[in-house]
Amino acid sequence: MNIHEYQAKALLKSYGAPVAEGVAIFSADEAAAAAKKLPGPLYVVKSQIHAGGRGKGKFKELGADAKGGVRLAKSADEVVAHAREMLGNTLVTKQTGPSGKQVNRLYIEDGADIDRELYLSILVDRSVGQVAFVVSTEGGMDIEAVAEHTPEKIVTVAIDPDKGVTADDLKTLTEALKLDGEARADAEKLFPILYKAFVEKDMSLLEVNPLIVMTNGRMRVLDAKVSFDGNALFRHEDVVALRDTTEEDEKEIEASKYDLAYVALDGNIGCMVNGAGLAMATMDIIKLYGAEPANFLDVGGGASKEKVTQAFKIITADPAVKGILVNIFGGIMKCDVIAEGVIAAVKEVGLKVPLVVRLEGTNVELGKKIINESGLNVISADDLDDAAQKIVAAVKGA
């Protein structure tokens, strides 16, 4: 689960992290009052969406020369002007896809005099099975680009869960970031605070980009991105209360009600598969044959007929879907259950696009028999390669 920047900063501030003063607003009418609550004279007006690249993003409704989703303002009047232009419009960034996200809230924050921009994140490093800090002196830019072009500028420090952040860890981190004086002292206080927040709140990612050193030598969390482990949310009612469902895909929300693993993508071939590995392989082979998957959808190993029906309905509700591939390898999941669920869904919502079904495993003959006797216009496939070729050909020929 993701939260907005202003929520992440409030959470980190509650642990003692240094963040600037700021006010979240939901309408342009609140902008002037928000600015008056801050010291000024420099303000930052930040679009609050669950996506990165806001500063370089562009609003669909505005001209090509319009400023992006993060703007500087030198007066309260300028804050108001930015708010009126940004709220309600659609911000397109490298992470939103071409459809973008509507900006429904802004964060008005006190400006900062920046001397250096650094990068810091905390995540689970699965290669060592520990929580790890990832830091770089190259802050304020895409860490992926740094990793690609200058990987030597990224330092990873795994934290022993029994010891927490030790003095040796702090020495390694502060030296990697080339910190000294007050900035180093601030970092030695901040890093254990961030680690504590990460662990106590069951985060899956805590990213501060940039973490800045100001001209006065002090450190500040200038931006914050926080994601939480969805499997641990039952322990954190306060975190669940921060959820903004308007930032989530409606189909993903609907899928979660039925315990379906669904992720919306930008392609036009809907996929219904059992097992995450097989689902990823299915998406890969669709791309191999020149098409793009519209979703990742794993119905799991013990899905019922009703669950399969809902999964199929979620796929068909996506107007971008021009064809559907059902790829099932039955183990715990029985092929006849899949067949019954697909047929029930088609009878309820209709079938307006090509449908390719590949079944293998437990009760496969019964599953095929159910589909063949259903009277539906279903294209059968013998294996994954055959299925991918058939659905791509059917969509391109439609």
From Swiss-Prot:
UniProt domain ATP-grasp: residue ranges: 9-254
SUPFAM superfamilies: Glutathione synthetase ATP-binding domain-like (SSF56059), Succinyl-CoA synthetase domains (SSF52210)
EC number in record: 6.2.1.5
PROSITE patterns: ATP_GRASP, SUCCINYL_COA_LIG_3
Binding site for Mg(2+): 209, 223
Free-text remark on how the cofactor is bound: Binds 1 Mg(2+) ion per subunit.
Positions bound to ATP: 46, 53-55, 109, 112, 117
Any GO CC annotation of this UniProt entry: cytosol
Source domain of life: Bacteria
Cysteines joined through disulfide linkages: none
Swiss-Prot/TrEMBL cofactor(s): Mg(2+)
Pathway: Carbohydrate metabolism; tricarboxylic acid cycle; succinate from succinyl-CoA (ligase route): step 1/1
One Pfam family cited in the UniProt record for this chain: ATP-grasp_2
Catalytic function, reaction form: succinate + ATP + CoA = succinyl-CoA + ADP + phosphate; GTP + succinate + CoA = succinyl-CoA + GDP + phosphate
Gene Ontology MF, one: succinate-CoA ligase (ADP-forming) activity
GO biological process, one term: succinyl-CoA metabolic process
Residue numbers binding substrate: 274, 331-333
Subunit structure: Heterotetramer of two alpha and two beta subunits.
Its biological purpose: Succinyl-CoA synthetase functions in the citric acid cycle (TCA), coupling the hydrolysis of succinyl-CoA to the synthesis of either ATP or GTP and thus represents the only step of substrate-level phosphorylation in the TCA. The beta subunit provides nucleotide specificity of the enzyme and binds the substrate succinate, while the binding sites for coenzyme A and phosphate are found in the alpha subunit.
Protein name stated in the entry: Succinate--CoA ligase [ADP-forming] subunit beta
